[in-house]
């Protein structure tokens, strides 16, 4: 089961929208493939600071985070857009992927 929660009042810069999409896709795929999660919650919210926050939380097995090609690509994309990506795990409560991006891509 995947639950999507959004709180956005406006559209996103196309580069930011792609980064949001890819982070959600990677987070959900990893939760199901590696964590064997039964429930995944995806939250996309706009902060008062003008940042976009993306959280992907799962109830999978958790464990050590081993960055592969997908997570490394997300990290680079976030940094190139002036944002940051963090991933945490506290077994056995699953994994929390958090992406913070500016509303508009950095030129």
Model-flagged regions — what are they?
Residues 1-107:
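Coiled-coil dimerization/phosphotransfer module
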């Amino acid at each position: 089961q995947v639950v999507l929660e959004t709180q956005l009042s406006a559209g996103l810069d196309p580069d930011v929208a792609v980064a949001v999409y890819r982070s959600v896709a990677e987070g959900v795929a990893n939760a199901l493939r590696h964590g064997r999660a039964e429930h995944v919650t995806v939250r996309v919210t706009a902060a008062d600071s003008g940042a976009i926050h993306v959280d992907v939380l799962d109830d999978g097995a958790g464990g050590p985070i081993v960055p592969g090609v997908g997570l490394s690509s997300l990290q680079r994309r976030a940094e190139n857009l002036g944002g940051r990506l963090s991933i945490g795990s506290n077994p056995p409560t699953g994994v929390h992927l958090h992406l913070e991006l500016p509303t508009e891509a950095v030129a």
